[in-house]
Regions:
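P-loop NTP-binding site
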Residues: 1-30, 36, 97-103, 107-108, ...
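Nucleotide-state-sensitive switch-loop elements of NTP-binding domains
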Residues: 2-10, 15, 19-128, 133-139
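Short, basic, glycine/proline-bearing loop/turn elements
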Residues: 8, 145-152
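Structural beta-sheet core signal
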Residues: 37, 142-144, 177
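Short, ordered loop/turn segments at secondary-structure junctions
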Residues: 40-43, 147-148, 180-183
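Arginine/glycine-rich "motif VI" loop of SF2 helicases in the C-terminal RecA-like domain
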Residues: 133-137, 166-173, 241-244
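Amphipathic helical hotspot of TIR/SEFIR-family domains
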Residues: 151-172
Length: 371
């Protein structure tokens, strides 16, 4: 059996994990890559994606059952569930084995819960994926989603940097950090006052000391006047730790934007190794062609500040125009194919008529009207 590839989707509550999995499923279906979503959140009873080709942990155990049986709260119940699951993975093994037996090239997408302690302080989730990786030769990449609203506050931005760094160290897997819902960023305020720095400052994670004066002002504005300087010093030390590790950077994602998805998935495929010679085996030839043609060079030339903040409306209009043109081209192509098929059917009828005429002349009999 060849190596199995996949993504582990993590992130705080509300960061868009299930929405991302839904969009990813549609994207992979479009490029011909077989995939399966595995929901690991026992509290998520409203899945936006199709459950026909997915595995749902709620089919076996729900958080409500754990809470009632063990008299635990939501977070405690979730940790208990994963600790129990880590000790006995037999059923989980069998279900994944069934999926891979049906199609050994299936790409696995793990939709994880939003409780951050599972991937920052509790090692159970890491142990589960470690065992799965050994069992099925899994090549996984962690996709850490962060809501774009967090970069509008300097202190919240530092907190998500710490969260991302901690998850990278805890999960011990290749990790791509993503600022999700980037298209919503312009809705959070006037674009001239929305961010004190350009968007690429927040994605490249450099020169964090520039945030110190802003954090002091922010602390004073929310009523922490007497502790503002202490908070600023604490933030300075935390910023030094983040910069010393030099591990955290961010990509941006709009789930409805094709170019944004192509750019992100190319990076993820490089991180887990899928892109290196496996795409043909997986059958997603369209994706292979996109990569070979160097589409990423074109996408990387787009300035994210200009695309998502300065000139977002103009870019959106241009993308919509391209989308409508693509739909029109497809309709014309389908129409041409139908015409060719009809002509082929007509030619077949003419050929059949000639054959029957020759048979009648040779035998002196009248052929039936039915073929």
């Amino acid at each position: 059996m060849p190596a199995t590839f996949g993504q582990v989707v993590i992130g705080p509550p509300g960061s868009g994990k299930s929405t991302y999995c839904n969009g990813l499923q549609q994207f992979y279906n479009a490029i011909g890559r077989s995939c399966c979503i595995i929901n690991l959140d026992p509290a998520n009873d409203r899945l936006p994606y199709s459950t026909l080709n997915s595995l749902d942990i709620r089919d076996y155990l729900t958080i409500e059952e754990i809470m009632e049986e063990k008299n635990l709260g939501p977070n405690g119940g979730l940790i208990y569930l994963f600790e129990s699951m880590e000790e006995s993975l037999d059923i989980f093994y069998l279900k994944i084995q069934e999926i891979l037996t049906e199609n050994e090239n299936t790409y696995l997408i793990f939709d994880c819960p939003g409780q951050v302690e599972l991937f920052t302080s509790n090692g159970t989730l890491f142990k589960i994926f470690q065992k799965l990786s050994k069992k099925f030769d899994l090549r996984l990449c962690v996709v850490n989603l962060i809501d774009s609203i967090y970069i509008t506050s300097p202190s919240k931005y530092i907190s998500v940097l710490l969260l991302s760094l901690r998850s990278m160290l805890m999960m011990d897997l290749p990790q791509v950090n993503v600022i999700s819902k980037i298209d919503m960023l312009s809705n959070y305020g006037n674009k001239d006052e929305l961010l004190p720095f350009r968007l690429d400052y927040y994605t490249e994670v450099q020169q964090l000391d520039y945030l110190q004066p802003l954090i002091e002002i922010e602390s004073e504005n929310i009523g922490y006047k007497y502790t503002a300087k202490k908070l600023s010093k604490l933030t300075a030390h935390l910023s030094e730790i983040i910069e010393d590790f030099n591990l955290v950077t961010f990509e941006v994602l709009c789930i409805d934007d094709k170019n944004s998805m192509v750019s992100l998935q190319t990076l993820i495929d490089k991180a887990n190794g899928y892109i290196f010679g496996v795409s043909e085996i997986g059958g997603d030839t369209i994706w292979s062609e996109l990569t070979r043609q160097g589409i990423m060079n074109e996408l990387n030339m787009v300035d994210i500040q200009e695309r998502w903040i300065d000139n977002k409306d103009e870019y959106d209009k241009e993308e919509e125009k391209k989308r409508l043109e693509a739909i029109k081209q497809k309709e014309l192509l389908d129409k041409e194919v139908n015409i060719q098929e009809n002509n082929t059917d007509g030619n077949e009828d003419d050929e059949w008529g000639r054959i029957m005429k020759d048979w009648e002349n040779a035998t002196g009999k009248v052929a039936s009207a039915n073929k």
